[in-house]
Design a protein with these regions (language model features):
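Short, C-terminally biased terminal segments at protein or domain edges
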Residues: 1-53, 57-117
């Protein structure tokens, strides 16, 4: 059963970054996965960090800029999740699909916040 998603977006982005970290610890250790995993870790954590910055911004312009960065990092997270090789592990594949869906949902939320589709 899938766990309920936090309503608070700051918490939701933190949970996403935590879930990505747990996932990366479990993937097969290949050279490609090591590199893609590093990029995924950076992008997933950057979503939440930039959202915190957006909430603390001093102007609307800065708020929108930070939300655009969040959207970009969400797209990057989905991209690197796509590249990671889970081997033949069905549970890892299921987890990857769920994480990709969450990255896409975060992207859509930030799209809405900045007023683009």
């Amino acid at each position: 059963m899938e766990k309920a998603k936090p309503y608070n977006l700051e918490e939701r982005t933190a949970v996403f970054a935590e879930d990505v970290r747990k996932f990366v610890k479990r993937i097969p250790r290949t050279q490609a996965n090591e590199e893609d995993g590093k990029q995924l870790l950076k992008a997933s954590g950057s979503i939440g960090a930039n959202y915190i910055e957006a909430n603390e911004s001093l102007s609307k312009k800065d708020f929108y800029y930070r939300c655009k960065v969040c959207r970009k990092e969400s797209k990057e997270s989905a991209f690197f999740l796509r590249l990671i090789d889970t081997g033949n592990d069905e549970s890892l594949e299921t987890e990857r699909r769920q994480l990709r869906q969450e990255a896409n949902e975060l992207k859509l939320i930030f799209n809405k916040m900045i007023g683009t589709n």
